Amino acid sequence: MEKIVLLFAIVSLVKSDQICIGYHANNSTEQVDTIMEKNVTVTHAQDILEKTHNGKLCDLDGVKPLILRDCSVAGWLLGNPMCDEFINVPEWSYIVEKANPANDLCYPGDFNDYEELKHLLSRINHFEKIQIIPKNSWSSHEASLGVSSACPYQGKSSFFRNVVWLIKKNNAYPTIKRSYNNTNQEDLLVLWGIHHPNDAAEQTRLYQNPTTYISVGTSTLNQRLVPKIATRSKVNGQNGRMEFFWTILKPNDAINFESNGNFIAPEYAYKIVKKGDSAIMKSELEYGNCNTKCQTPMGAINSSMPFHNIHPLTIGECPKYVKSNRLVLATGLRNSPQRERRRKKRGLFGAIAGFIEGGWQGMVDGWYGYHHSNEQGSGYAADKESTQKAIDGVTNKVNSIIDKMNTQFEAVGREFNNLERRIENLNKKMEDGFLDVWTYNAELLVLMENERTLDFHDSNVKNLYDKVRLQLRDNAKELGNGCFEFYHKCDNECMESVRNGTYDYPQYSEEARLKREEISGVKLESIGTYQILSIYSTVASSLALAIMVAG
């Protein structure tokens, strides 16, 4: 009889009404790193490192790029006959040049301050080509005989389309004095050149005068050129060389030319009608008939992520380049689902779950919440208010990081001439150093934010637990695993009052007091003495004691 009484008392305790505080868990295998830990499994995570591109050259915000194909910038501007498709070009978003374009300076030579000119082009979006000195205006000089087999067109000798190679006429080369006044409202890009013959015989054959010069002057330019006559190896079948120059002629300024030989005169100039962010990008890609906000030499990026690891050189509204291979931001909680335990026919609601033992996969409509068990049944209920606040907080954090990193900028490689190799090497080392620092900062930012996010979730669960504990006080017992065992009956209405913060402590305090006194000890008459048994709150302990007494 005593055994039956004791067993009945224990089972009654096991069936006491309970409420637990816990958090959401799922089948996610997403892992993040924090300052303190690596490979922490979380319920939700967001990759913030873009690793993909489309492998194409695209329009940038609806404006097509100027893809020079087999032409170089020099070949385009001077008018290499093989670059006729670029005689007139519309507005461009950026310029694409191959690493080694075939159609460059067809007549061998050099383009003075070429790298500086390219840098200038990275701030221009549109040229308008205008004629400044008509080719037919050179009545005292031959303007059509200045051609070369090095610049063929349709099987015949030709020359650059935008400049005129002036040759002697009737064995005379009168001194040239020409001026052009820029009456436009825009700046003007003006190009000209000088021919360096192979020997003195070629000099007099072309220009009659054995000693010649070219003078060029503007309000800011004072240049005097003389030909360098020397024996050279043949390039493109030519022993001679040409050297080209450029300047920006401001509105209302004039450019003055004077020469008695070797002069390559401008016929056309480029009116700079639109300035803006552009770039000259080295790429072998083809046009993909697509649109993007961010272009790299490897392809276009269409992403809202704040970082990418595709290529350090970009144009447009791009994520920041980092050298990292993985940047994952925690947005959810630590994911440690409880192990599913077999349910016995004993009226228990299953594994007691809490924020200490593990998360609940059964709670799918919130990050934090409750599990209750009473005579009416058991179930999960998310705490919508704390969940929504947490979602808003994490979302704002992610958006803030993205907004800070997604800024309009361009990072295109700078070009240096042969005399500036040490500067180029120093520049590369500095850029590599900046990338290393930025990569470190990005990785550290992610580690710190992940640590804060997981701590934030832990704190929210603890706050929810304290909210319940302060309401129940001594009307329930803390089981130490995120659960409370009521000392009174708590139906579904009572459970809801605990969840929404309206639990009426005085209403249940008397019933709870009597229950506490009832279970404070058990009288064991069979041995004629009384002992106080510690009643364990866990399911396993209760069942083990029941089996021992019954046996």
Swiss-Prot record:
Task: Kindly list the places in or outside the cell where this protein is found, as annotated in its UniProt entry.
Answer: Virion membrane; Host apical cell membrane
Listed GO CC annotations = host cell plasma membrane; membrane; viral envelope; virion membrane
- Coiled-coil region: none
Gene Ontology molecular function:
host cell surface receptor binding
PTM comment text: Palmitoylated.
* Lineage: superkingdom: Viruses
Q: List the disulfide bonds.
A: C20-C483, C58-C290, C71-C83, C106-C151, C294-C318, C490-C494
Q: Where is this site: Cleavage?
A: R346, G347
Sugar attachment sites: N26, N27, N39, N181, N302, N500
Q: Which UniProt keywords apply?
A: Clathrin- and caveolin-independent endocytosis of virus by host, Clathrin-mediated endocytosis of virus by host, Disulfide bond, Fusion of virus membrane with host endosomal membrane, Fusion of virus membrane with host membrane, Glycoprotein, Hemagglutinin, Host cell membrane, Host membrane, Host-virus interaction, Lipoprotein, Membrane, Palmitate, Signal, Transmembrane, Transmembrane helix, Viral attachment to host cell, Viral envelope protein, Viral penetration into host cytoplasm, Virion, Virus endocytosis by host, Virus entry into host cell
Record SUPFAM superfamilies: Influenza hemagglutinin (stalk) (SSF58064), Viral protein domain (SSF49818)
Membrane topology listed for this record: Single-pass type I membrane protein
* InterPro entries xrefs: Capsid_hemagglutn, Hemagglutn_HA1_a/b_dom_sf, Hemagglutn_influenz_A, Hemagglutn_influenz_A/B
N-terminal signal peptide: 1-16
The UniProt transmembrane annotation reads 531-551
Major localization class:
virion
- Outline which residue ranges sit on the Extracellular face: 17-530
Q: Name one GO biological process term.
A: clathrin-dependent endocytosis of virus by host cell
Q: Main role? A: Binds to sialic acid-containing receptors on the cell surface, bringing about the attachment of the virus particle to the cell. This attachment induces virion internalization either through clathrin-dependent endocytosis or through clathrin- and caveolin-independent pathway. Plays a major role in the determination of host range restriction and virulence. Class I viral fusion protein. Responsible for penetration of the virus into the cell cytoplasm by mediating the fusion of the membrane of the endocytosed virus particle with the endosomal membrane.
Please state which protein family the record places this protein in: Belongs to the influenza viruses hemagglutinin family.
Q: How does it assemble?
A: Homotrimer of disulfide-linked HA1-HA2.
Misc remark: Major glycoprotein, comprises over 80% of the envelope proteins present in virus particle.
This protein is called Hemagglutinin
